[in-house]
C-alpha cells in the first residue's frame, strides 16, 4: 500500500466550526491509522475576506483537540507565483485561453438563456479566438474543457459519479486581476503536496469534475475522493448556531472535553459495529473511510452531553483541577486531599460539563444565603429545630474523618426520635446546602468539615 497523504484545507474567512473539525478528524485518522502524512493548508487566496484571527483560531482549535499535522502549514497566499506558472503552462499548451467577455455581455447572455429556459452558462465564444483583443477589457483565463467526454470517478462515500463534460462550460481558472480561482489552486496544491485521498464535505462534490479536468490537463495523478454528507440538527435541518454550528473553541469554553468532542464528531457519519465510545487510540485502530455513511448525520446535544459526562467521570482529581482552571469557582485551598477527592468524585458523577462541575463546586462550598422556598414551607419547625439543635451537639463528638461515623450520627437521631428519615434529612440538607437536592449528606458533612457544618446549621436555626 502506498503512503496515505491527506490534508485539511480551511478558508480563514471565519472560525473553525463543527463540520470543519469533523472533516479534519476524518483526514487525520485515515492518515495516522496508516502511518501516513496529514497536512494543514490555509486557503487564503481571497485576500479581501481573510482574517488572521480566524487562521490563528483554526490552529488553536487543532492544538486543543490534539490534531498534529506534519511539516509547516501551507498558506496559499504565499504561492501565487507557483499558480501563475501553471496557468501560463496551460496557456502555452493551448489548454487554456484568455476570455475577453465583459460582465455586461455575460449577464446579457445569461438572461437570454433563462428566457429560452436553458441553464445559464458561458458559451465558450472565446475558446478559439485568434483576433485582436478588444480594448479596455482585462481578460480572465478559462480552461478548455474537453467536449463530449464523460468524467467518472468512484467516490468512497457516494459511489460511482459520472458527469458529461458538455454540462460544464470553460470555467475560469484566473480572474481578470490575475488571482487564481478556488478549483485551480486546490488542484495545484493537492497535486504538488502529493495528496492521495481527499475527505471533504459533499458540498464540494460539484467541484470535483472541474478539478478532474484540471488534473488531466496538467497530467497530475487524481486522488481518491470521499464526499461526506453534511451534519443536520435533530429536526433534519442545516445546523445553525443554536444547534451546534459554532466556533469549535466555544465548546472548550462551555466545558466540553476534547476527548468527548473528538469521539462525538468521529461518530457523526462514521460507524464501527455498535460501539459508541472510542479513545483516540481506538479510533486509530478502527477508522476506515470505507465505513463513512452516505446519509446525513444528526447533531445531538443529548449524545454529546452523555459522552462528555462519561469522560468527565473518568478524570482523576489532579486532571480535573487542571481542566477546571479556566473556570471560576470557590477556593479549594482549605480542603485537605481527602475532602478534595470526595468533593470532585461526588460532583463529577452529577455533572455533564466542566462548567456545570464548577457551578456545583460553588453550590457546595458557598454557604447558603437563602433557602429553597418550596422545601422550607413543608418543614414542621416545631419538630425540625430541636432535631437540628441536638444533631449540632452530636457533631461536636463525631469523627469527621470517617463518613460512616457521620452516617451513624444521623441515623442515631432518627432512631432516638423515632421519626422518618426524611423528616430529619430534608431540613439538614436545607441547612447545609440551601436546597432539597444535591450530593449525599454524609459526603456534604465530610467535605464541609466540622466547623463549617456546625456554622451552617447554626445560621439556619437563627433564620
Curated annotation (Swiss-Prot):
Endoplasmic reticulum as UniProt keyword: no
Localization, UniProt: Cytoplasm
Residue ranges annotated as motif 'HIGH' region: 10-20
Keywords annotated in UniProt: Aminoacyl-tRNA synthetase, ATP-binding, Cytoplasm, Ligase, Nucleotide-binding, Protein biosynthesis
Annotated Gene Ontology cellular component terms: cytosol
Chain location of the short sequence motif 'KMSKS' region per the record: 238-242
Catalysed reactions, as listed in the record: tRNA(Glu) + L-glutamate + ATP = L-glutamyl-tRNA(Glu) + AMP + diphosphate
Top-rank EC class of the record's enzyme: ligase
Keyword 4Fe-4S listed: no
Any one of the GO BP annotations: glutamyl-tRNA aminoacylation
Enzyme Commission code(s) on record: 6.1.1.17
MF GO annotations: ATP binding; glutamate-tRNA ligase activity; tRNA binding; zinc ion binding
Function statement: Catalyzes the attachment of glutamate to tRNA(Glu) in a two-step reaction: glutamate is first activated by ATP to form Glu-AMP and then transferred to the acceptor end of tRNA(Glu).
Family: Belongs to the class-I aminoacyl-tRNA synthetase family. Glutamate--tRNA ligase type 1 subfamily.
Entries under HAMAP family matching the protein: Glu_tRNA_synth_type1
UniProt subunit comment: Monomer.
Stated name of the protein: Glutamate--tRNA ligase 1
Taxonomic lineage from the root: Bacteria, Pseudomonadati, Campylobacterota, Epsilonproteobacteria, Campylobacterales
Gene designation: gltX1
Amino acid at each position: 500500500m502506498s503512503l496515505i497523504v491527506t490534508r485539511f484545507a480551511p478558508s480563514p474567512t471565519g472560525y473553525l466550526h463543527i463540520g470543519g473539525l469533523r472533516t479534519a478528524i476524518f483526514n487525520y485518522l485515515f492518515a495516522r491509522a496508516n502511518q501516513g502524512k496529514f497536512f494543514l493548508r490555509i486557503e487564503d487566496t481571497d485576500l479581501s475576506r481573510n482574517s488572521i484571527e480566524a487562521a490563528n483560531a483554526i490552529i488553536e482549535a487543532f492544538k486543543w483537540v490534539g490534531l498534529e499535522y506534519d511539516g509547516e502549514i501551507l498558506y496559499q497566499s504565499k504561492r501565487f507565483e507557483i499558480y501563475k506558472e501553471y496557468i501560463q503552462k496551460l496557456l502555452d499548451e493551448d489548454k487554456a485561453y484568455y476570455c475577453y467577455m465583459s460582465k455586461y455581455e455575460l449577464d446579457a447572455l445569461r438572461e437570454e438563456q433563462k428566457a429560452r429556459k436553458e441553464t445559464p452558462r458561458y458559451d465558450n465564444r472565446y475558446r478559439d479566438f485568434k483576433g485582436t483583443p478588444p480594448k479596455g477589457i482585462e481578460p480572465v483565463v478559462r480552461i478548455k474543457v474537453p467536449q463530449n467526454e464523460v468524467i467518472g470517478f468512484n467516490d468512497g462515500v457516494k459511489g460511482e459519479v459520472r458527469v458529461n463534460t458538455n454540462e460544464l462550460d470553460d470555467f475560469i481558472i484566473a480572474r481578470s486581476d490575475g488571482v487564481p480561482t478556488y478549483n485551480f489552486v486546490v488542484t495545484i496544491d493537492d497535486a504538488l503536496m502529493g495528496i492521495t485521498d481527499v475527505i471533504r464535505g459533499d458540498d464540494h462534490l460539484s467541484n470535483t469534475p472541474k478539478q478532474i479536468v484540471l488534473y488531466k490537463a496538467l497530467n497530475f495523478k487524481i486522488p481518491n475522493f470521499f464526499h461526506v454528507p453534511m451534519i443536520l440538527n435533530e429536526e433534519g435541518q442545516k445546523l445553525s448556531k443554536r444547534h451546534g454550528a459554532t466556533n469549535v473553541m466555544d465548546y472548550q469554553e462551555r466545558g466540553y472535553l476534547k476527548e468527548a468532542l473528538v469521539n462525538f464528531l468521529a461518530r457523526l457519519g462514521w460507524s464501527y459495529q455498535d460501539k459508541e465510545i472510542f479513545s483516540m487510540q481506538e479510533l486509530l485502530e478502527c477508522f476506515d473511510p470505507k465505513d463513512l455513511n452516505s446519509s446525513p448525520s444528526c447533531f445531538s446535544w443529548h449524545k454529546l452531553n452523555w459522552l462528555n459526562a462519561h469522560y468527565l467521570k473518568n478524570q482523576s482529581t489532579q486532571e480535573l483541577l487542571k481542566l477546571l482552571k479556566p473556570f471560576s469557582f470557590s477556593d479549594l485551598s482549605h480542603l485537605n486531599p481527602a475532602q478534595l477527592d470526595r468533593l470532585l468524585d461526588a460532583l463529577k458523577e452529577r455533572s455533564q460539563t466542566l462548567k456545570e462541575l464548577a457551578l456545583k463546586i460553588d453550590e457546595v462550598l458557598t454557604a447558603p444565603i437563602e433557602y429553597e422556598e418550596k422545601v422550607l414551607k413543608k418543614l414542621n419547625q416545631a419538630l425540625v429545630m430541636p432535631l437540628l439543635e441536638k444533631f449540632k451537639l452530636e457533631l461536636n463528638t463525631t469523627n469527621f474523618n470517617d463518613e460512616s461515623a457521620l452516617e451513624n450520627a444521623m441515623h442515631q437521631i432518627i432512631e432516638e426520635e423515632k421519626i422518618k428519615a426524611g423528616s430529619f434529612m430534608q431540613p439538614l440538607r436545607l441547612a447545609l446546602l440551601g436546597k432539597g437536592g444535591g450530593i449525599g449528606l454524609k459526603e456534604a458533612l465530610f467535605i464541609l468539615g466540622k466547623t463549617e457544618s456546625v456554622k451552617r446549621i447554626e445560621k439556619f436555626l437563627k433564620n
